[in-house]
Amino acid sequence: MIVGHGIDLQEISAIEKVYQRNPRFAQKILTEQELAIFESFPYKRRLSYLAGRWAGKEAFAKAIGTGIGRLTFQDIEILNDVRGCPILTKSPFKGNSFISISHSGNYVQASVILEDKK
């Protein structure tokens, strides 16, 4: 049974402005594994990756119903499976989780669905 659904839309240019003012912003948002992937990319790809992880983590927080206020970005990790699809590899939710991240122009959209294991 679906117990939560969250969606987030993020402008990549807004993330770029924050990142340019404070490059440590990425360390606040990304886990150690996500940060290693982020650092392997050229600048433009870094921005879309960071915006995608931001949107995915915001969507997760909305789906679980707490918002980021009760979670930290470090509580949630989004990596890719062998096909390149994003997956939630770390979160406080114990059921099944499904994530989709889509990029289009200056925008990134993420959707998270949480399903009870029952």
Swiss-Prot record:
Enzyme Commission (EC) number: 2.7.8.7
Record keywords, A-Z: Cytoplasm, Fatty acid biosynthesis, Fatty acid metabolism, Lipid biosynthesis, Lipid metabolism, Magnesium, Metal-binding, Transferase
Named cofactor requirement(s): Mg(2+)
A Pfam short name: ACPS
GO-annotated molecular function: holo-[acyl-carrier-protein] synthase activity; magnesium ion binding
Subcellular location(s) of the protein: Cytoplasm
Statement: the UniProt record of this protein carries the keyword Lyase: no
Coiled-coil segments: none
Reaction(s) catalysed (UniProt annotation): apo-[ACP] + CoA = holo-[ACP] + adenosine 3',5'-bisphosphate + H(+)
Main location: cytoplasm
One of the protein's GO biological processes: fatty acid biosynthetic process
Keyword Magnesium attributed: yes
Residues involved in Mg(2+) binding: 8, 58
Cellular component annotations (GO), alphabetically ordered: cytoplasm
Recorded family membership: Belongs to the P-Pant transferase superfamily. AcpS family.
Its biological purpose: Transfers the 4'-phosphopantetheine moiety from coenzyme A to a Ser of acyl-carrier-protein.
Name the UniProt record assigns to this protein: Holo-[acyl-carrier-protein] synthase
Gene that encodes it: acpS
